[in-house]
């Protein structure tokens, strides 16, 4: 209790010295600051950046290679979606160890690019309150903007982070976007969350590649989005996997894992299986009376996940080789097209016109 009282007193002193008001600070941020104070961090000194060796980093990357093959294309897409300059995107493991980064030239020369680098550890107990570290602690999306950072050295940075939650409910990584700009904060966080959901969906499909996967949502127009609930069902009609959205939407029912489909929904699995396998969208009701629309996402043994072979490098077309930004944009477009082999699908995925896609692949 004495330690907590001491930390609260020091918290107020720090706010006064930095001309900040506690009532303008969110609860998550203020609690993070108190944890930092209790750890012995001093916001008026430069943080002691902790880096692992290049050999260690290489070994950890190799151990996470299968996961990185799914994550890297998503952070490349996220980077292309964030408008403006001086932005960077990073992927860290579940402990806040940065493994991969993408940033523009302006960011590389600034505070963000020089400090958020592969091999750096951004856990809260090391770097104080920051977006990446706070998502590690809270296991939820976070924004830490400007003076909300515990260390004065980080005051010019805004961070947007979201955890990657695996099919078993465990946090397996963090996606973070950082900049020195304060504009479009909620928009940026929404894009970061979208990237993590897409990663989670791909991991779920990969894990249950031999099962029937059903997508469901209370609104039929959302069935093609990353906000859907996913259920993996075996040949006996038993649920063997459920994603986070499914658990939220079916909260209050039985424990989903290893539960028979018929104990979750009033429509028996055998009565709708034929229509589902024929790609029909059905409206079904759970045992609490809530209705959802459901459609087959994947048939038994029909995994749609394609491993990205990082050894087969995609190069920019001739007209895009004059600047780094042009090259990076072109490589992203060409690699996305090669992955999907469909101009329309690549256009929707990247949010650019089909004409733009066509220019870069011919």
What positions do the PLM features span?
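Signal-transducing coiled-coil/dimerization helices and immediately adjacent hinge/linker segments
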Residues: 202-260, 323-331, 335-338, 343-344, ...
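Intrinsically disordered, low-complexity terminal regulatory regions
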Residues: 1-125, 133-143, 156, 165-236, ...
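N-terminal sensory regulatory modules of PAS/LOV and PAS-like folds
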Residues: 132, 254, 261, 269
């Amino acid at each position: 209790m004495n330690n907590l009282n001491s930390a609260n007193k020091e918290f107020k002193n720090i706010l006064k010295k930095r001309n900040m008001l506690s009532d303008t600070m969110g609860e998550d941020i203020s609690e993070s600051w108190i944890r930092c104070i209790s750890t012995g961090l001093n916001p008026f000194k430069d943080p002691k950046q902790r880096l692992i060796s290049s050999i260690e980093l290489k070994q950890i990357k190799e151990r996470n290679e299968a996961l990185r093959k799914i994550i890297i294309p998503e952070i490349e897409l996220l980077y292309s979606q964030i408008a403006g300059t001086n932005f960077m995107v990073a992927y860290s493991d579940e402990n806040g160890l940065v493994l991969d980064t993408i940033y523009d030239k302006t960011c590389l020369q600034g505070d963000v690019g020089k400090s958020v680098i592969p091999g750096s550890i951004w856990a809260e107990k090391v770097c104080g309150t920051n977006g990446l570290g706070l998502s590690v602690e809270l296991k939820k999306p976070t924004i830490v903007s400007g003076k909300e950072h515990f260390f004065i050295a980080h005051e010019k940075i805004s961070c947007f982070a979201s955890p990657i939650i695996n099919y078993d409910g465990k946090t397996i990584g963090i996606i973070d976007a950082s900049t020195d700009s304060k504009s479009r904060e909620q928009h940026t966080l929404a894009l970061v969350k979208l990237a993590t959901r897409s990663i989670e969906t791909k991991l779920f499909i990969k894990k249950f590649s031999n099962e029937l996967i059903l997508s469901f949502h209370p609104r039929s127009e959302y069935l093609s989005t990353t906000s859907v609930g996913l259920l993996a069902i075996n040949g006996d009609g038993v649920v063997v996997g459920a994603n986070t959205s499914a658990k939220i939407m079916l909260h209050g029912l039985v424990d989903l894992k290893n539960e028979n489909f018929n104990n979750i929904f009033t429509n028996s699995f055998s009565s709708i299986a034929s229509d589902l396998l024929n790609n029909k969208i059905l409206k079904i009701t759970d045992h609490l009376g809530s209705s959802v629309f459901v459609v087959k996402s994947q048939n038994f043994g029909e995994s749609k996940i394609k491993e990205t072979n990082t050894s087969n490098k995609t190069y920019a077309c001739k007209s895009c080789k004059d600047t780094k930004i042009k090259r990076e944009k072109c490589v992203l477009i060409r690699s996305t097209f090669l992955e999907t082999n469909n101009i329309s699908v690549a256009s929707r995925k990247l949010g650019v016109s089909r004409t733009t896609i066509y220019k870069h692949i011919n």
